[in-house]
A protein has these predicted regions:
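Hot-dog-fold acyl-thioester-processing enzymes
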Residues: 1-56, 112-139
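Residue-level preference for beta-strand/loop junctions
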Residues: 4, 51-53, 69, 85, ...
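Generic short beta-strand
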Residues: 10, 90-93, 108
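Hydrophobic beta-sheet segments that form the core/acyl-binding groove
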Residues: 58-96
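Glycine-rich beta-strand-turn "strand-cap" elements at beta-sheet edges
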Residues: 60, 109-110
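Residue-level signal for glycine
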Residues: 98-100
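A structural microfeature
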Residues: 102-104, 120
Length: 139
């Protein structure tokens, strides 16, 4: 499991003065892609013409988060389905107090960027994912 700290900016704040529905998902995906750049998977996705595609996301909102608040982003790749073309990912956003603010559980698959079809990912991509985030059960 990998994590990073994020300071919430005004672009994620809704009319209620807290991070809104779209804001939480944007924070999570922005941090996810930044993390992918840091570990080199963004380039690997392009080199190997295979990248993740999300089919569904379930978001549980547990605590309010406000502008300028520091939160911690954590990502886990959960035990994959038997079909190796698919994946399950959990993203957690924690308040600085340690309280869980948001849980995002997503299901997706690996997408061949040339054929535009679902595929089994190359071993090189899976080795990077196994090294950087893995958890054996959904919490």
């Amino acid at each position: 499991m990998k994590s990073k700290k994020i300071v919430v900016t005004s672009k994620y704040i809704d009319q209620n003065g807290h991070v809104g529905e779209a804001g939480y998902l944007s924070i999570a995906i922005d941090a996810l892609w930044e993390f992918n750049r840091e570990i080199g998977t963004s380039q690997k996705f392009l080199q190997l013409s295979c990248a993740p595609v999300t089919f569904s996301s379930k978001i549980d909102y547990l605590k309010e988060v406000f502008e300028h608040e520091e939160i911690e982003f954590r990502i886990e790749r959960l035990t994959p389905p038997e079909d190796k073309r698919k994946w399950i990912r959990k993203i957690l956003l924690f308040k600085s107090s340690g309280e869980l603010a948001v849980r995002i559980l997503a299901n997706g698959a690996w997408f061949d960027l040339n054929s535009r079809k679902i595929t089994t990912p190359p071993n090189e991509i899976m080795e990077i994912f196994d090294k950087n985030f893995y958890d054996s059960e959904i919490k």
